[in-house]
């Protein structure tokens, strides 16, 4: 497989040289005469494969041309990135050099009255910081670019391996079928082969991606990543400086950082207060709802208790009425019983008299 080797040596001017060596053309050129020799050495069979060979050659030529165009576009993009000029702020005067600045610092008497070494030092410091930040961005961009290119190469290798594996499997299956065409035996397929066939059938075909759009997205994403990383590093430095570390910065810068930090803390506190207010309002609404429910339940219970009491009183009144009726009936029955008893006693007292009269009548009848 052809592999692109990209060597990007760096010097003081960010990128001095960019080399793109591709082995694909050389490999393809070396492979041509060998293939031709092999084809010439083989005896021709009865069939004429000229149409298939011409189609295969055309496909190979198109693939090589596309590879060359893609590699050329990548090389152009890399060259444009490599030889892009670094923006520098010309804050220091052109005549002032590091040697002059060192001499002025060592021998302050030689310095002119109108010069201000402190201002020159600040200018040089700003320029140095700008240069270091630019170089850092350039190195970071280069590292990200190389890592992403390496990742793309590995991805291409994996894709080619995936595309090659089903072809070999299908070729082996075709050979098996050809060998077993004359036989009437049943073919036994293992479970793994069956599952792999289903996966290959269900696997969707990947859509071709335009290389120009892919390159544009790649470099735009690279620049965005570099800017994000630089901003994050600057924020970390500002936070560490404001946390109390000894940094040689001006008092105004420290005050600005402190004010920004206080503003950020105030915003956090305001957000917390707003959240607490929301929660308090929600709890108040829930408290009102619960209070209303409790009042309704109390009313319902009171109504139920009153109903129960009224029903009990009615039942008591009914029972009292029944009791009075039963007591009156008992008194009536008692009087009737007494009357019957008196009647029985009167009859018992009159019974011997009647018996004596009956005996006298019987005796008189016997005499007659």
From Swiss-Prot:
Gene Ontology annotations of biological process type: signal transduction
Coiled-coil stretches noted in the UniProt entry, renumbered to this chain: 52-82, 256-350
GO cellular component, one term: Golgi apparatus
Bias-annotated ranges (Low complexity): 33-56
Record InterPro entries: GKAP1
Principal location listed in the UniProt entry: Golgi
Polar residues bias locations: 88-100, 109-121, 239-250
Domain of life: Eukaryota
Biased composition, class Basic residues, residue ranges: 170-180
Keywords from the UniProt entry: Coiled coil, Golgi apparatus
Location in the cell: Golgi apparatus
Region (Disordered): 18-127, 152-260, 333-368
Compositional bias (Basic and acidic residues): 152-162, 194-238, 251-260
Family the entry assigns: Belongs to the GKAP1 family.
Function: May play a role in the regulation of insulin-dependent IRS1 tyrosine phosphorylation in adipocytes.
Protein name (record): G kinase-anchoring protein 1
Lineage start: Eukaryota, Metazoa, Chordata, Craniata, Vertebrata
